[in-house]
Amino acid sequence: MYKILFKNRINLLFLLISFLCLINVVGIDNVSFKSTEWLYIGAGESSQHQLGWHFFKNDIWRFPLGSNPNYGDEFSNSIVFADAIPILALFFKSLKSFIPGSFQYFSFWYFICFFLQLFFSFKIIKKFTGSDLYSVIGSFFFLISPIFLYRVDEHVALASQWLLLFALYLGLTQKIDKAKLLWILLIILSSLINLYFTAMIVTAYSLLRIFNLKFEKESFYKFIKDFFIMTLLLFLTLYVVGYFEIRVADSLSAAFGKYKLLEVA
């Protein structure tokens, strides 16, 4: 009973710290879902995120689901290229009849990132120390690490570094062949947040599976089958969310639009 109560207290502490961090980053007046002005101030990319979400929310449903053709110029676009947290964009668009016209979810995402950064770092440290106290103290260092703080308030999707901590926790605590479903779910989840994290997590998962194949004598057939399933599910997710809406030829063409400012007859 004591352990359960103590763990609940730790989670409550993490929630409180996460909320205080959120206030420090966005300000108490900007915590509300209705507050959007702060996203257009500063040198970060928050205005890009909010504009992408605004166009996406006010458009009809299309397929792929992440299609956002009204955001951009002269070629189709997708919510993923606005770095607007596709998983939340899709969720809140499905609720657009119930949310106000001026609406943002980025402060909520910061709160989630702060909490999960603390939560998973606590779990990892606890694995090695066995001490709740040391783990709580150690988790604070993950919260104030420069590589994390540098992304906060600059690139909201890249503040989701808890995804990497989750992957590290899985690698440390679960046998890779027994936790493959969790790994695949994590890979799919990361692709709905930012593809950079997907690349890193897929690399970690692949190395662990190769290690398991070589030293644990895992079946090669099972190895290939699992990777085929993972790849199929990942590419299906990428397609549905709209990662392939911009053609490679369009994105790489030289002198796009011939530098034009105005349409010339």
Where are these regions (language model features)?
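Start-transfer (signal-anchor) and selected internal transmembrane alpha helices
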Residues: 1-33, 222-231
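Membrane-interface coil-to-helix junctions
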Residues: 19-117, 145-159
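Membrane-embedded helix bundles of polyisoprenyl
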Residues: 111, 115-124, 133-174, 179-211
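Perimembrane helix-loop-helix junctions
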Residues: 198-232
